[in-house]
Amino acid sequence: MVGKLITFEGPDGAGKTSALEAVVARLQKEVSQEIVVTREPGGNPISEQIRQIILDVKNTAMDDRTEALLYAAARRQHIVEKIQPALAADKLVICDRFVDSSIAYQGAGRGIGEEAVAQMNLFATDGLTPDLTLYLDVPSEVGLARIKQHRQNQYDRLDQEKLAFHQKVRQSYLKLAQAHPDRIKTIDASQPLEAVVTQCLQVIAQANLHLFEV
């Protein structure tokens, strides 16, 4: 048996991480597989160190391609060290962000090119693709307002980008969802958290992942 990989995606302020945590808490009561929860960039010591470099607000001189390459490097180490071993052990891996984030943020947001970033990550992942992606969608204005309200001036380097950047990111996500409807399922994240969580669980249950079989 081989485990399954579910990823959560969404623009900043979509409430993605809160939804993921609530979904995992429910799934742990309902599925027999061991669940491994992880995040990107990060998930292991090397990738967490790269994360600090990427998000450090002092690194204003970082080149856009450098940023994209750092994400890809962190992802590669994460896959080799954590994701692949978990999948090989028939575990359910739930990851906060994956390749779609790089395509949206660096490919579209930074303007490097979505296809260029996709190819870069094809090399980094060796073709590993999520079995299911939950895309939590929220208008950019709403997302940024939530960030301002909840993070109390504790912004990382990407949070500080202007509205136009975040709008490009969202449009790229929507395009990805349209291009990969079997894998990427869109959730309206402007709803209350409990409604978002319920919808996420429904999508997971309807996906042909065999998670709830005895």
Swiss-Prot record:
Reactions it catalyzes: dTMP + ATP = dTDP + ADP
Keywords: ATP-binding, Kinase, Nucleotide biosynthesis, Nucleotide-binding, Transferase
One Pfam family hit: Thymidylate_kin
EC number in record: 2.7.4.9
Coiled coil segments of this chain: none
GO terms assigned for molecular function: ATP binding; dTMP kinase activity
Entries under InterPro entries matching the protein: P-loop_NTPase, Thymidylate_kin-like_dom, Thymidylate_kin_CS, Thymidylate_kinase
Taxonomic superkingdom: Bacteria
One cellular component (GO) term of this entry: cytosol
Binding site for ATP: 10-17
One Gene Ontology biological process: dTTP biosynthetic process
Biological role: Phosphorylation of dTMP to form dTDP in both de novo and salvage pathways of dTTP synthesis.
Family, as annotated: Belongs to the thymidylate kinase family.
UniProt name for this protein: Thymidylate kinase
